Amino acid sequence: TFGGGLLATCGLASTGAPTEVDGMAYGQHGRISHTPAEQVTWQVEPGEVRITGTAGVGTPGAPALRLSRTFSASTKEARLSIVDMVSNEGFAPAGHMFRHHLNFGYPLVSENSRLTTEVIPIGTRDGARPGPLSADQFLFRVADRPVDEMVWYADSGDGRAELVSPDAGVRLKLDWSIDTFPRFIVWRNASPGVNVLGLEPSTSRDGGRAEAAESGELIMLQPGEARTYVTEITVERL
């Protein structure tokens, strides 16, 4: 959830800013992060622990979308994979948006940390056009007073980012499915006492459902149709 933790899931019908479309209100980042999981199971196999569950969003007369999630954790290396399938269980086409919002803080995020990625920057929330994200060393500077958050948008490129932290002595590798996550968002709040970096495979930018519909980033799932999203996190010692 957005109260804390490594992963906050955004969707299923909207992500980004709150908007109203055709008389229906869509809250910031959607409802799925507040929806309890159902049918939760776990299984231990040689080399792997797997947890599965489902969660659905929908109201009478509105599209019915369901998330089926599998967490797989390796017992041989520091690797976690998240495999999500979002399906339209209704009888009419359903607009769909989705994002894996991954949060990182100290000591992974410090002034000595570096982000390496081949994603292709396409803009920022405030309308500026950024340079290569790997060259933005200010990503990791901690402010001496409260500052506004910053958001960068990128095309997913090869679907990989690496966060290297000499202070923590680790390299974190993030890989995601570029066929279903065509966008990548970097969110940074450098305020003292916050110091958080968000790395976010996404289907769209941050303007909300109305903007996504105008830009062509809103996905329409037909009845019975499903999309699969994959994100993998690997941590290695330097």
What residue spans do the PLM features occupy?
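Surface-exposed acidic/polar loop and edge beta-strand patches at domain peripheries
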Residues: 1-75, 79-81, 92-95, 103-150, ...
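A short beta-loop-beta micro-motif enriched in histidine and acidic residues
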Residues: 99
